[in-house]
Amino acid sequence: SEYNPTYSSTYNRVIERGNVICGTNDEFPGFSQEIWNNEDGDRWEGFDVDICRAVAAAMFGDADAIEFTIVNGKTRFEFLIDGTIDVLSATTTFTFTRNVAKKLEFMPTTYYDGQGFIVRKTLGVSSAKQMQGARICFSSTGTGAKNIADYMELHGINYIPVAVKPTEKTKNVYKRGDCDMYGTDRSGLASNRLSFDDPDRHMILPEIISKEPLGPVVKYGDQKWSDVVRWT
């Protein structure tokens, strides 16, 4: 029989509006960043951005039938659930809790990552295991806090946690010198390092302390819309 899913509020809203609203990070080179050039003016570029453009192309045959809304660790799920955005493409980790408790539907993983650490080379360390007593900063809303706690406990390392609220960028707290080491997905560390004024003075340590399957997210229960995003 013909496939005919139930009414999808997001799908119908997108059709009526004529474009897709994508929630993504800002200042994340390689994944999502607004760049100005003489030919196009301001234009969003990056891996997560291209995923959203592909969804727009699947819906309308036009990859530019898209709007981008900047989200942070706190607003990304709120905006998705309340309909401010249609799809979230912002280096978001697929977890059991987010899937079940927050009523979110994760699409196929588009990037397999793992959490790591970045430090200033002046510290003279080559491993996270040498960071006894260090101040370690991480986003208060991500998976980082538990990953770091588990890793440090496993290796008997005492540290000072510095949880950064979503209203402030963790990389800026690190750049200010308010922590000795910064922990997040290694793709994020590499991207953030490139944005520093002095990238050569910072190094990503070799440890990978978690597995982070990243991918786009839609609201749970919107079957027709989730099919569009999943099969794009």
Role assignments for model-derived ranges:
Residues 21-30, 41-59, 93-95, 112-169:
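Bilobed "Venus flytrap"/periplasmic-binding protein-like clamshell domains
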Residues 1-5, 11, 49-53, 57-58, ...:
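Extended ligand-binding regions for polar small-molecule ligands
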Residues 15-16, 56-64, 81-85, 122, ...:
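Sec-exported extracytoplasmic/periplasmic mature domains
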Residues 3-90:
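Extracytoplasmic small-molecule ligand-binding "clamshell" domains
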Residues 7-8, 65-78, 123, 160-176:
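Short helix-initiation/N-cap motifs at beta->coil->alpha
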Residues 33-35, 147-151, 194, 229:
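Short, solvent-exposed loop/turn and secondary-structure capping segments
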Residues 165-196, 200, 216:
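Extracellular/periplasmic bilobed ligand-binding domains
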Residues 53, 57, 61-130, 186-210:
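Acidic, polar ligand-binding/catalytic clefts
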